[in-house]
Amino acid sequence: NLLALSIGSERKYIPNADVNTSFAGTYWNSDFIFPNSSNVKVTETELRPLSLAEMRIARNEIFARHGRQFKDPMLNKWFYSKAWYLKINTKYSPADFDALPDQMNAIEKANIAFILKTEQNRMKNQTIFPDASTRVLSEYDVSLSKDVLKKALNEIYTAEKVPVGQKTTLSKVALKNVEQIEGILNTSEVKY
């Protein structure tokens, strides 16, 4: 069973088994994080329990409703797993979407700005992965910018009370997360 991803004119197939369902199980089996974000303003109360990765998906699902595809393969994998996204006949590469006349209504624009501001505030003022010593992070969790992942890496060492780079004294879960983040930081691929 394959999941088809079309990015611009390129079509790729990913085995469904490779689609990570451990991330936000609540959301994997539902259609939207915020089903009404096209016509109802998202509130701080609704964003508070979400992780950075969940907020990123919630923000990008507004774009996805208009057929936008993404440079980040994780976002494409996420949205191509949703029946509503598969039903959109015309999908646009990021460049083609950006060249279109404005697609968003005022509520969508406000929600995008509010979610992004909340993400930025959380990145500055809160621990990125407060449970990184007790839970293995999924590929969706770590699908963040390299700057955010560098901060998260330092936070994991701090939470474990271990000097940065002293991997041998990290807990098994923290070590797995550190290695996963370091692997991303050592690639040239840019997440945003």
Where on the chain are the PLM-derived regions?
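Intrinsically disordered, low-complexity linker/propeptide segments enriched in Ser/Thr/Gly/Pro
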Residues: L2-E10, I14, T127-Y192
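Zn2+-dependent metallopeptidase catalytic domains
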Residues: P15-V40, F63-F70, M74-N76, D131, ...
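Compact alpha-helical subdomains of small soluble proteins
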Residues: F70-N125, S171, E179-Y192
